């Protein structure tokens, strides 16, 4: 790997880690939101329904809802940084793969995750803007995208693990 490739990988990894810090522990991170809603935190990393969203938002005042809105704006940045990190990892782990179909699937999983995350964030941010009115259909749709996002993260982790094992097997066969 050349020097530029290493620098790009370091930058992508650092952007991912910094954005992860901000969505978890930053000034508007999930740990801050949890202080506002009796420890529930954000809904976007849980399986949820309309009642859970209502319960998570009801203890929050207008100022706290504004902080929650900021969380989703920061989370959009995290979605992009995490996506770049995921794509970098699958690219590196599966650099030996020659099948176009398998490559499309491998790269498709993190892209699908990112699309689901963006749609979910947009719906939940819109929900915060319309609160205290909550559109039950929108929350149901958002929850489906959240489930798909969480499943695709699990599939991505499994793919990376399989790719690493595959690389070791190929290395040992030499």
Per-range role (PLM):
Residues 6-10, 66-69, 73-76, 101-111, ...:
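Alpha-helical transmembrane segments of integral membrane proteins
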Residues 20-27, 70, 143-146, 150, ...:
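Multi-pass alpha-helical transmembrane bundle typical of ion/small-solute transporters
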Residues 1-3, 93-101, 172-174:
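Membrane-interface helix-boundary motifs at transmembrane edges
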Residues 113-162:
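Alpha-helical transmembrane segments of multi-pass integral membrane proteins
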Residues 3-70, 132:
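Interfacial loop at the N-terminal end of multi-pass membrane proteins
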Residues 56-61, 65, 81, 85-94, ...:
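Membrane-helix exit/interface motif
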Residues 70-90, 157, 161:
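Hydrophobic alpha-helical transmembrane segments
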Residues 88-129:
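Hydrophobic alpha-helical transmembrane segments of integral membrane proteins
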């Amino acid at each position: 790997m050349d020097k530029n490739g290493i620098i790009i990988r370091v930058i992508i990894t650092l952007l991912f880690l910094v954005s992860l810090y901000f969505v978890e522990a930053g000034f508007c991170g999930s740990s801050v939101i949890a202080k506002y809603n009796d420890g529930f935190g954000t809904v976007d990393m849980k399986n949820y329904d309309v009642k859970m969203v209502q319960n998570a938002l009801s203890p929050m005042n207008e100022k706290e809802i504004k902080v929650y809105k900021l969380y989703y704006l920061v989370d959009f940045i995290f979605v992009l940084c995490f996506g770049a990190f995921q794509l970098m990892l699958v690219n590196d782990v599966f650099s030996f793969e020659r099948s176009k179909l398998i490559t499309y699937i491998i790269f498709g999983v993190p892209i699908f995750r990112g699309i689901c995350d963006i749609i979910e964030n947009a719906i939940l941010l819109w929900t915060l803007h319309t609160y205290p009115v909550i559109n039950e259909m929108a929350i149901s749709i958002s929850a489906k995208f959240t489930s798909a996002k969480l499943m695709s993260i699990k599939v991505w982790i499994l793919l990376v693990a399989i790719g690493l094992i595959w690389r070791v097997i190929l290395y040992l066969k030499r």
